[in-house]
Amino acid sequence: MIWRSRAGAELFSLMALWEWIALSLHCWVLAVAAVSDQHATSPFDWLLSDKGPFHRSQEYTDFVDRSRQGFSTRYKIYREFGRWKVNNLAVERRNFLGSPLPLAPEFFRNIRLLGRRPTLQQITENLIKKYGTHFLLSATLGGEESLTIFVDKRKLSKRAEGSDSTTNSSSVTLETLHQLAASYFIDRDSTLRRLHHIQIASTAIKVTETRTGPLGCSNYDNLDSVSSVLVQSPENKIQLQGLQVLLPDYLQERFVQAALSYIACNSEGEFICKENDCWCHCGPKFPECNCPSMDIQAMEENLLRITETWKAYNSDFEESDEFKLFMKRLPMNYFLNTSTIMHLWTMDSNFQRRYEQLENSMKQLFLKAQKIVHKLFSLSKRCHKQPLISLPRQRTSTYWLTRIQSFLYCNENGLLGSFSEETHSCTCPNDQVVCTAFLPCTVGDASACLTCAPDNRTRCGTCNTGYMLSQGLCKPEVAESTDHYIGFETDLQDLEMKYLLQKTDRRIEVHAIFISNDMRLNSWFDPSWRKRMLLTLKSNKYKSSLVHMILGLSLQICLTKNSTLEPVLAVYVNPFGGSHSESWFMPVNENSFPDWERTKLDLPLQCYNWTLTLGNKWKTFFETVHIYLRSRIKSNGPNGNESIYYEPLEFIDPSRNLGYMKINNIQVFGYSMHFDPEAIRDLILQLDYPYTQGSQDSALLQLLEIRDRVNKLSPPGQRRLDLFSCLLRHRLKLSTSEVVRIQSALQAFNAKLPNTMDYDTTKLCS
């Protein structure tokens, strides 16, 4: 803080106590400028220009001390002594006594010279540059005693690392310096002696002692004759007042405007604020007053230095022992994709810690660059030429994974290229191909290799389940045709099949054996009781080399004249034989399933053809068809337009004759297909005793296809029926344990295949 000596002398001559003290920013700026000339090459000189009250902050003072000394850290311990409390009686006298201010004649003369309407430049030259912008209201004068230690942490850490076990007792650490600084006011002489010894022995620290005011000159008889300093501790605050309160009313507003222009615009323009934005309205001689070119240039240089530091951090990471050791441990006998490298990365704790250290350093660097960029934009928003801002892109873990791949596969002949996992190729410098190494085979699931060939790492050695090795590559195994095991389709087209079903053509009739203990064909019977009948093929006895598909069912039912009976049919289908409990119920007229079609025949009796057409959409395997016939009474409703059915007939008066019923014929429409049970048994045998390498997988693939195609023909429902187990159980005569073993083997094999999804089935056959 600088005092105007001439003004101070005049005021002391007027009053016993200080009545008016003015702070002169002008003299303070000259002092800083003098220092700045001595350090023209310092990178922080751009901060030391005249920018107003900012330079009186404690943070800025600490920064200047630290940067001027060339050290990275500053430790200071001090104590203050408040001797005198100083008040400005000039303002108090004006406020309470109403007397004129006892100001210096030169100050009055400068005010009169300004006139009634001075320009901002005149106010700046005659008042601000001579007397400053503020004067002192109250403060505390006293003394201070302080010890300042400037420390270069890098030199200190290198010195500590270089010390061996025999010199550890004399090595200097930050903890040692903290202890010495804390003991300064307890034992000053020995503390200074030890610190000066460390300063001489090492260039890592510099010690400065400051003693000002009466505290440092306590041996004087008259302390009043000793020059004092302003005490700026929190309990002794300095109170300032704007100089405009001492000026006439007509000058106050213009003075404030001139002071702001002087501080913010360096007297090169007029300071203007509008809509929460402030700027300088530049004068004709200073068109770039809003554009601090020196500051902008310094910030651009800082960004360049940050870029260089960014490159150095990345280079240090690549050259670190952790990175080299991680690269050395990577397997070379198969290709490493980014997922595999990331998995190995997470397993290496040392490498992870080193990468986290790099990330933290980069984050701090990036935040520092962001602050500079934001300030750069703020300073240059009114410049005619915008600054050049170039920041390196932050390198994520994905970049380093690709970088590691480049070191592995694009680092031949002293050239390092860039690897692309998508194209599986390298991009070499100057569009050359000499940096590309031989890529090992890819190990993984599906079509990737199970292992690489030991004699040639670029080719597959073995393949995964469901794939076969072909010329060094793994190709999907395609199951051989299952037509020689079991047939599924007929030669008839859909339209032909539909036409033959409509005509109930005998060419698609499957001849089955009719069996019933309750009735006979072409014979009248009393329908009061439920009748059971079945059509069976007895394939195991007569047609062991065939399986059969049902496409439709037709019955011709006749009733006596004027009968009110209505037949009700329930159909169960047994796919491959076995007991009746292993049959499934046909959901007629449910969930879009076909319904019975009734056609009246041109006969004297009431005869109808009842036809159920399944077609290709609802066709399924059948060995036996169980038909249950019940009857119900049909009568007109109360409105005459609707029918009401009564059942069961067992509870109707036995003496009441409801008529009789007979079934002339029953036909099953469908077709028979080739079936070779011995060949399928031989296929199953290969699961335990494969003929050659790969024949077991081929057999499993064929059995899977047979299983899926058989189960696909199950009736509609939320879950498919397990028809394949019925085929094994009744047509191949396998035991229950063998069926379970085969199904388990198929499920396990299917789970290993790529892009497959198994499905749940409902058990039908025990």
Swiss-Prot record:
It comes from the Eukaryota. Glycans are attached at residues 168, 337, 456, 562, 609, 641. Keywords: Cell cycle, Glycoprotein, Growth arrest, Mitochondrion, Secreted, Signal. SMART domains: MACPF (SM00457). Strongly expressed in oral keratinocytes compared to the weak expression in tongue squamous cell carcinoma (SCC). Expressed in endothelial and aortic smooth muscle cells. Overexpressed in gonadotropinomas compared to normal pituitarie tissues. InterPro entries: BRINP (IPR033237), Growth_fac_rcpt_cys_sf (IPR009030), MACPF (IPR020864). The keyword Mitochondrion applies. Residues 1-33 form the signal peptide. Residues 74-264 form the MACPF domain. It is found in: Secreted; Mitochondrion. GO terms for cellular component: cytoplasm; dendrite; extracellular region; mitochondrion; neuronal cell body. GO terms for biological process: cellular response to retinoic acid; central nervous system neuron differentiation; exploration behavior; multicellular organism growth; negative regulation of mitotic cell cycle; positive regulation of neuron differentiation; social behavior. Its main location: secreted. Inhibits neuronal cell proliferation by negative regulation of the cell cycle transition. Promotes pituitary gonadotrope cell proliferation, migration and invasion, when overexpressed. May play a role in cell pituitary tumor development. Belongs to the BRINP family. This is BMP/retinoic acid-inducible neural-specific protein 3. The lineage of its organism: Eukaryota, Metazoa, Chordata, Craniata, Vertebrata.
